[in-house]
Design a protein with these regions (language model features):
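Membrane-interfacial alpha-helical segments at the cytosolic side of multi-pass membrane proteins
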Residues: 23-30, 127-145, 175
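Interfacial helix-loop-helix junctions of multi-pass membrane proteins
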Residues: 62-69, 121, 155-175
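Membrane-interfacial catalytic/cofactor-binding modules of polytopic membrane enzymes
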Residues: 59-139
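Interfacial segments of alpha-helical transmembrane regions
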Residues: 22, 26-60, 66-78, 82-83
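Divalent metal-coordination and catalytic microenvironments
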Residues: 18, 41, 61, 126, ...
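Aromatic-anchored segments of alpha-helical transmembrane domains
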Residues: 49-55, 151-162
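N-terminal transmembrane-helix/juxtamembrane module of multi-pass inner/ER membrane proteins
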Residues: 1-23, 31, 60
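Membrane-helix interface segments
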Residues: 34-38, 141-151
């Protein structure tokens, strides 16, 4: 996973999280094939945000590796090799995670609040929702959808660590 091509693929895949999530939400909002499953999905989706995104994020307030050095944690160079490698890759192609991380850190320093402006690492909502979407995929007859959502979950789990958003344990707790 150390090469620029792999990082590019992970970067693109990780940034597809919002479109995939919105597609799944839209699909579930307008499908009437299995109303019981649909209701379970939406209840689970809401509970993921309440339990993981509010309750556990407050209890386990933390910052990911991308903010580790900026926040002044010791040793200061614990994740500098990872960040240096990601920054070296971005010289030839943009890694969107890095510019987003810079923007989030500026928001934090300026005490700006708003939707999507937090830097909490544990638990990972990307991993939590990707896992929920994978479970939904397992309930479908469409094999492509099952495989896609399973691979997408794995990509998000790996990408959250590879792109320095999260520690591995953040993703495990999210599940």
């Amino acid at each position: 996973f150390n090469g620029p091509l792999t990082t590019d693929l992970i970067n693109i895949g990780y940034n597809l999280w919002f479109p995939v999530m919105f597609f799944i939400l839209y699909w579930q909002a307008f499908t009437f094939k299995n109303p019981c499953l649909r209701l379970k999905f939406f209840y689970s989706f809401i509970l993921c945000w309440i339990i993981n995104g509010v309750l556990l994020a407050t209890i386990f307030s933390s910052v990911g590796p991308c903010f580790y050095e900026r926040a002044g944690f010791l040793p200061l160079d614990a994740y500098s090799e990872l960040m240096a490698r990601l920054n070296a890759f971005t010289e030839s192609r943009p890694i969107w995670a890095l510019s987003t991380q810079d923007s989030l850190w500026r928001n934090y320093l300026n005490s700006e609040t708003g939707l999507g402006s937090g830097i909490s690492a544990m638990p990972s909502m990307h991993v939590s929702i990707a896992f929920l979407m994978m479970l939904l995929g397992f309930s479908q007859e469409n094999k492509f959808l099952k495989v896609f959502l399973c691979l997408f979950f794995i990509l998000i789990l790996i990408g959250s660590v590879h792109l320095a958003w999260h520690y591995a344990v953040d993703g495990y707790l999210s599940i």
